[in-house]
From Swiss-Prot:
SMART domains: LYZ1 (SM00263). It is an enzyme of class 3 (hydrolase). This is Lysozyme C, milk isozyme. Lysozymes have primarily a bacteriolytic function; those in tissues and body fluids are associated with the monocyte-macrophage system and enhance the activity of immunoagents. Gene3D superfamilies: 1.10.530.10. It comes from Bos taurus (Bovine). Keywords: Antimicrobial, Bacteriolytic enzyme, Disulfide bond, Glycosidase, Hydrolase, Signal.
């Protein structure tokens, strides 16, 4: 009985953690979903962004006390502007999706929303982590050995 309980708890913890991509697995997935070169943003920039925003974790969330918004998913897309979580005041929901869609292991909707973000005038600069960790850096290591 104890063993069954332990197995159940382990399965629950895996379900809560979501999918944590490996670097090359993410690079291949993003390429397949059309992010390589989208709006002039290289695949290496997208992988770098995901590394520093979520550590490649689809279930990452971060609450922002200042404006009471939350960042969701592998790209940490914000509920103030891009998705609806039902609790962020004055949310815009420009991607027209529930924020929960950004937490799925299948990142198709997260990629579609990220494409929407970079179509705005700020482009990829909308992400602070990209500006701080990826901008003007040699990013080849993010796709090196990935055969993409």
């Amino acid at each position: 009985m104890k063993a069954l309980l332990i197995v159940g708890l382990l399965l629950l913890s895996v379900a809560v953690q979501g999918k944590k991509f490996q670097r090359c697995e993410l690079a291949r997935t993003l390429k397949k979903l059309g992010l390589d070169g989208y709006r002039g943003v290289s695949l290496a920039n997208w992988v770098c962004l995901a590394r520093w925003e979520s550590n490649y974790n689809t279930r990452a969330t971060n609450y922002n006390r200042g404006d009471k918004s939350t960042d969701y998913g592998i790209f940490q897309i914000n509920s103030r502007w891009w998705c609806n979580d039902g609790k962020t005041p004055k949310a815009v929901n420009a991607c027209r999706i529930p924020c929960s869609a950004l937490l799925k292991d299948d990142i198709t909707q997260a990629v579609a929303c990220a494409k929407r973000v970079v179509r705005d005038p700020q482009g990829i600069k909308a992400w602070v982590a990209w500006r701080n960790k990826c901008q003007n850096r040699d990013l080849r290591s993010y796709v090196q050995g990935c055969r993409v």
